[in-house]
UniProtKB/Swiss-Prot annotation:
Activity relative to temperature: Optimum temperature is 45 degrees Celsius.
Subcellular localization(s) per the UniProt record: Cytoplasm
GO molecular function per UniProt: nickel cation binding; urease activity
Similarity comment: family membership: Belongs to the urease gamma subunit family.
Protein name: Urease subunit gamma
Associated pathway: Nitrogen metabolism; urea degradation; CO(2) and NH(3) from urea (urease route): step 1/1
Subunit structure as annotated in this protein's UniProt entry: Heterotrimer of UreA (gamma), UreB (beta) and UreC (alpha) subunits. Three heterotrimers associate to form the active enzyme.
Higher taxonomy: Bacteria, Bacillati, Cyanobacteriota, Cyanophyceae, Synechococcales
């Protein structure tokens, strides 16, 4: 199997997001890499499901709360940017202050 660097990056995000999901389900708080991976994964999946950039930017602020991440993480994650594939091409999605 031959994967491009972008495909490898997306697989790494998915792997980290699956770990984050398991930890959330166990009631554990996410650290910085886990929180970013989880948010990035939800953007990628939302784009795949046909949601618009605007919808994802709006929904992205509801996916994680301060109670689900370790102390100080909301201040560290002020912005998440991810390139996602939409039906009409690849677009950059930016989540501003996604952990509230």
């Amino acid at each position: 199997m031959h994967l491009s660097p972008q495909e490898k990056d997306k697989l790494l995000i998915v792997t980290a997001a699956l770990l984050a999901e398991r930890r959330l389900n166990r009631g554990l708080k996410l650290n910085h890499p886990e929180a970013v991976a989880w948010l990035s994964f939800l953007v990628l999946e939302g784009a795949r499901d046909g949601k618009s950039v605007a919808e994802l930017m709006q929904e992205g602020t509801t996916w994680l709360s301060r109670n689900q991440v370790m102390d100080g993480i909301p201040e560290l994650v002020q912005e998440v940017q991810i390139e996602a594939v939409f039906p009409d091409g690849t677009k950059l999605v930016t989540l501003h202050d996604p952990i509230r």
